[in-house]
Amino acid sequence: MLSSFFIIADQGDILIEKHWRGLMNRSICEYFWDQVLQSKQNGSSVPPIISTPKYYLINIQKQNVYLLGVCQSEVSPLLVVDFLQRIYDTFVEYFGSNITSATIKENFVHVYQLLDEMADNGFPFTTELNFLKEMIKPPGVLSNVISSVTGTSNITDILPNGSLGAIQWRKTGIKYTQNKIFFDIIEEIDCIIDSNGYIVSSEINGEILCHCNLSGMPDLTMTFNNPRMLDDVSFHPCVRYSRWENDRVLSFIPPDGNFKLLSYRVKGINQFPVYVKPQISYSEGSSSVGRVNVTVGAKGYNVQNKLSIEDVVATIPFSKTTSSTNLTANIGSFGMDEQSKILRWNIGKIPKEKTPFLNGTVSLIAGSMTPESTPSIMLQFKIPQYAISGLTIDSLACSERYKPFKGVKCTTKAGKFQVRS
């Protein structure tokens, strides 16, 4: 599968390199970084799969780092992408959600220890987080002090309890004074809306995250209000797939701590919580001027249901020939990057008493051609305590004698939410 693995910083520096099938020349990373720079110049994202005469370069970008897998022969691309994502998720659990170049450098030893356990000869081997945490202790001030004083390693010498059993993701003998389990339903909206407000394409990508603090070996059964609407469902290994196929019921023995229970897609969504009305046009002439009028607001049913639409940001990529702007906004703040000519309008929380708008003019460089097309607006937002698909958890039964405390939280946010002007 993987011949080599690299972690590359956002400036092109190689932070981590791991080789399983012979030492690979670093020039392959230079070739990859050239592709990244070329994609940035074109205003696009780097392709996840890059083919070269000798290798296949498969990558994911996360925050300020790139995870790059190099394969010498054809493999299933999704398998490699999923493995790279699993590596990144493991780093997040060990080092925190903000994975930067500094984070990787500070936890250099732990990164290599995790890679040694997670892959065997380039193939995924141990990827279950709870199992890894039993073998490699997460970094911390206390653990570092103990290791330096006693001279002991943070890697255990014996296999964790239950590692050779059928339920490898959960160790035996877990006890809590307070038994509780929480679920987060997080849904992202990916859609394209044309200039007339009609939906060109739309889908929801959702996931259910779980935080489990239950004693013993609990066997849980979960039911949903409308499980038939879920497409392309991907489960944690703890879920009994046959039970889902037959009854659309989730039956599982959960890992201890945090884990992703499942991910899914929902298609055919035709109503969104926010609307964008963009009007961007350019006049013909030697000194072309563009008129801008963009309105962002909440749909009426959201106001009635008292939903809170927060962290709203509208991004407008203007023409490279734009020289200056004369814009005003009644809510929030905005600014344009002089190099990329991308305007970012930070609205924040949409108020219920008035509608945010941005209007004014943009001027083009003298003698430049009028843009052939108007820009598409990318919108970001977050709605707490709301699942746009309508998915809810109807019931959760536990096989243990105790009665656990249960909680569910929903969040809807924008993924690739594009509105054409």
From Swiss-Prot:
Gene ablation phenotype (knockout): Cells are viable but are unable to retrieve efficiently some proteins from early endocytic compartments.
Keyword Membrane on entry: yes
Keyword presence, Cytoplasm: no
Ranges for domain MHD: 178-420
Keywords attached to this entry: Endosome, Membrane, Protein transport, Transport
GO biological process: cellular response to starvation; endocytosis; endosome organization; endosome to lysosome transport; intracellular protein transport; lysosome organization; pinocytosis; protein localization to extracellular region
Subcellular locations according to the entry: Endosome membrane
Quaternary structure and interacting proteins, as annotated: Adaptor protein complex 3 (AP-3) is a heterotetramer composed of two large adaptins (delta-type subunit and beta-type subunit), a medium adaptin (mu-type subunit) and a small adaptin (sigma-type subunit).
Task of the protein: Part of the AP-3 complex, an adaptor-related complex which is essential for the compartmentalization of the endocytic pathway.
Protein name per UniProt: AP-3 complex subunit mu
UniProt source species: Dictyostelium discoideum (Social amoeba)
Gene name per UniProt: apm3
